[in-house]
Regions:
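Local cysteine-cluster metal-coordination motifs and their immediate loop/turn environment
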Residues: 14-17, 53-73, 90-91
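Short Fe-S-cluster ligation motifs
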Residues: 45, 83-124
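A C-terminal junction/extension of Radical SAM enzymes
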Residues: 1-21, 53, 65, 114-124
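C-terminal accessory region of radical SAM enzymes
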Residues: 17-61
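A generic structural signal for secondary-structure junctions
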Residues: 30, 38-41, 71, 75, ...
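Short cysteine/histidine-rich zinc-coordinating motifs and their immediately flanking basic loops
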Residues: 69-75, 80-82, 100-104
């Protein structure tokens, strides 16, 4: 619940996929962004996002990367038959598992004080 959306007129919403009157947190012209992010409504929005994840997602090895993604995209069933699986789940898993070795190499470079961009020379 921390990726808010702001419209051109300053209206702020819980998420860019929920730009509906029900999810309007306020307007940046008359309410601080901090107030909106930390509002009870927004905290409940974020909590519901986590609380509605099916067990398949809660036990997933890449959940820390996608967090179940957007609730609007959770319209498939898990292999166990539970509702709430993100329709991009399989692609996310493939991407994160494919890119993990490169991410780990970049993290190792950072730990020794080198630029992660050096990985580009290693890949060439």
């Amino acid at each position: 619940g921390t990726a808010l959306a702001m419209e051109h007129n300053g209206d702020v919403y819980s998420c860019d996929h929920y730009v509906y009157p029900r999810y309007q947190l306020g307007n940046i012209l008359n309410r601080s962004l901090g107030e909106m992010v930390n509002s009870e409504f927004q905290r409940a929005f974020g909590k519901a996002k986590a609380d509605t994840l099916p067990r398949y997602c809660r036990e997933c090895e890449v959940r820390h990367l996608c967090h179940g993604e957007c609730p609007k995209h959770r319209f498939l069933r898990t292999p166990d038959g539970d509702p709430g699986l993100n329709y991009l789940c399989r692609a996310y898993k493939r991407f994160f598992n494919h890119s993990a070795p490169a991410m780990q190499r970049m993290a190792a470079l950072l730990r020794i004080g080198r630029a992660p961009a050096e990985i580009m020379r290693q890949a060439a």
